Each structure stands twice: as structure tokens, then as C-alpha cells.
């Protein structure tokens, strides 16, 4: 049987506003039937703190620290918590809710899409599996996250490699389309990450930091060899093809598409109204 062909875009390192605008545009174009399901890889220039759609900047984020480090800042159209995008491979998957391979529930769709990530880790020679919360306490933890830091708690079907969470993902559904995007960390600057959020006091900050160490890990902490961004791209490209049983076809945006995304970035994702609205 011939495999279904999905589109693949590697947009390289882009501005925070452009990155979010392109994800939104792909969702829109797919909902209008203009493009097939799409998988996109990207990076960030400058390194960026992205926050979840529902987060309150004033209450949770130390904007002075964001400025001090020269980081970009953007609010995502997806939920979840704060993510520092630096040395990582970021991916997004855009596919119709009605696609025959997509289960109806968010959790199950998350598992199906994340199968591509799981296979990618295996191509890198790492033992990856899905964590499912078993105890009532673990389930309660999911509903009441203890901190604004996204990698703090594995969520349903979170990917765990060698017992530690490696890939954080968020999902939204709009116009009948699923957008899931997430981060695959190669390296992580923990000091920087923990200085970007507000805490009731130093003790809480330290406790969260210790917890975090046991739960979150970057790929290059798990292996002796240094995995480059290009190696990661290759592994996860193959991983998505295998995990979703599709053939990925590389695609470059047209000038018109590029212009549309740039306008959306400027008029929405670069504005204070969007980024600081809550």
C-alpha cells in the first residue's frame, strides 16, 4: 500500500513572532484545504521564552530577567507553561481532527502524534517510552501544576527517556485542525531557565529546581556522544515517517505564503496586546 504523503517544512531559526505566525498560518491553510497535513521543524533567533496562552505575565514571568539575557518573548496559541527555547529542535504537527489516523480525544491524538517523537529518540539509540500517570496523586499533579515551568511534570503520554522527561508538547484545536508543537531539548541552561520565573520565595525556587532535575533532561545528558541539531533533525524526520506511517515531502514556502506569515507575525505575535494581554 502506498503511504500517505505529508508536507515537511524545515524553516530554520526564525523570530519568535514568525514561528508562532507560521504555525497558525499552517493550521489555517490546512483547515481551508489548501495544504496537506504538515510537519515542521524550526529553531529560534534569538533564544526565546514562550508562554502558554493562559499564563499571566505579570504574576508569573520576570521580564527583567528575559531582557537581561536578551531573550525573545512570545505567547503561544497553545496552552501549557513557560518554555525556554534555546538549544533544541522544535517541531509542529498540523493535521485535521477528522483525519482517519487521529483519535477524537486530545490525549489519544497526543499519543498518536508523539509516536513520531518516540521513534525519533529510538533512531538516536535512546530508550524512549510513554509515561502514563497511574496513581491518583500523579493525576492530581497534572491538574494542578506546581510551577510555571513546563518541563516540571510529565503530562499524559509524556515521553520519557531513561526515566526522565525529554520532550514537552502542547496542543490546540481550532477550525477542525489539531496543532501540536513541542520542544526536543539538546542542551538546557538550567540557571537561565529558573531565573525567568517569579517565585513566592527562594526556598520554593530551590525546591522546584531540585524536583526539576529528577524529571527533565536534555538529550545530550543521556548520551556520551554529542548529538548535533542536524543529527536530531535526521532522526526525528525518520521518526515521524515511521511513527505516523507517512512519507514526508520537503516544501519551501512561496513568496505569497511568506508575506502572509510576516504580516500575521507583525500584526499579532509582535504586539504587546497579544503577548501581555492577560
Swiss-Prot record:
Residues 33-248 form the BPL/LPL catalytic domain. GO terms for molecular function: lipoyl(octanoyl) transferase activity. Pfam families: LplA-B_cat (PF21948). It comes from the Bacteria. The active site is at 150 (acyl-thioester intermediate). Pathway: Protein modification; protein lipoylation via endogenous pathway; protein N(6)-(lipoyl)lysine from octanoyl-[acyl-carrier-protein]. It catalyses: octanoyl-[ACP] + L-lysyl-[protein] = N(6)-octanoyl-L-lysyl-[protein] + holo-[ACP] + H(+). The record marks 165 as: Lowers pKa of active site Cys. Transmembrane segments: none annotated. Its EC number is 2.3.1.181. InterPro entries: aa-tRNA-synth_II/BPL/LPL, BPL_LPL_catalytic, LipM, Octanoyltrans_LipM/LipL. The keyword Transferase applies. Signal peptide: none annotated. Keywords: Acyltransferase, Transferase. GO terms for biological process: lipoate biosynthetic process; protein modification process. Monomer. Belongs to the octanoyltransferase LipM family. In the reaction, the free carboxyl group of octanoic acid is attached via an amide linkage to the epsilon-amino group of a specific lysine residue of lipoyl domains of lipoate-dependent enzymes. The reaction proceeds via an octanoyl-thioester enzyme intermediate. Catalyzes the transfer of endogenously produced octanoic acid from octanoyl-acyl-carrier-protein onto the lipoyl domain of GcvH, an intermediate carrier during protein lipoylation. This is Octanoyltransferase LipM. It comes from Anoxybacillus flavithermus (strain DSM 21510 / WK1).
Amino acid at each position: 500500500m502506498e503511504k500517505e504523503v505529508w508536507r515537511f517544512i524545515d524553516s530554520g531559526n526564525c523570530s519568535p513572532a514568525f514561528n508562532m505566525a507560521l504555525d497558525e498560518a499552517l493550521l489555517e491553510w490546512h483547515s481551508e484545504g489548501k495544504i496537506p497535513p504538515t510537519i515542521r521543524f524550526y529553531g529560534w533567533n534569538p533564544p526565546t521564552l514562550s508562554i502558554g496562552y493562559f499564563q499571566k505575565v505579570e504574576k508569573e514571568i520576570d521580564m527583567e530577567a528575559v531582557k537581561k539575557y536578551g531573550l525573545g518573548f512570545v505567547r503561544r496559541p497553545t496552552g501549557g507553561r513557560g518554555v525556554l527555547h534555546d538549544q533544541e529542535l522544535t517541531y509542529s504537527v498540523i493535521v485535521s481532527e477528522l483525519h482517519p489516523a487521529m483519535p477524537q480525544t486530545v490525549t489519544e491524538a497526543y499519543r498518536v502524534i508523539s509516536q513520531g517523537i518516540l521513534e525519533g529518540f529510538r533512531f538516536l539509540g535512546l530508550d524512549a517510552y510513554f509515561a502514563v500517570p497511574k496513581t491518583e496523586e500523579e493525576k492530581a499533579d497534572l491538574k494542578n501544576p506546581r510551577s510555571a515551568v513546563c518541563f516540571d511534570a510529565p503530562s499524559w503520554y509524556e515521553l520519557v527517556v531513561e526515566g526522565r522527561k525529554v520532550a514537552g508538547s502542547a496542543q490546540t484545536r481550532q477550525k477542525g485542525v489539531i496543532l501540536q508543537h513541542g520542544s526536543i531539548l539538546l542542551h538546557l541552561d538550567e540557571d537561565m531557565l529558573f531565573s525567568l520565573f517569579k517565585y513566592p520565595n527562594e526556598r520554593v525556587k530551590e525546591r522546584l529546581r531540585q524536583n526539576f532535575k529528577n524529571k527533565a533532561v536534555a538529550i545530550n545528558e543521556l548520551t556520551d556522544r554529542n548529538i548535533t541539531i542536524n543529527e536530531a533533525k535526521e532522526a526525528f524526520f525518520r521518526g515521524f515517517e515511521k511513527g505516523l506511517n507517512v512519507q514526508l515531502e520537503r516544501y519551501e514556502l512561496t513568496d505569497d505564503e511568506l508575506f502572509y506569515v510576516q504580516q500575521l507575525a507583525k500584526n499579532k505575535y509582535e504586539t504587546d496586546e497579544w503577548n501581555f494581554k492577560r
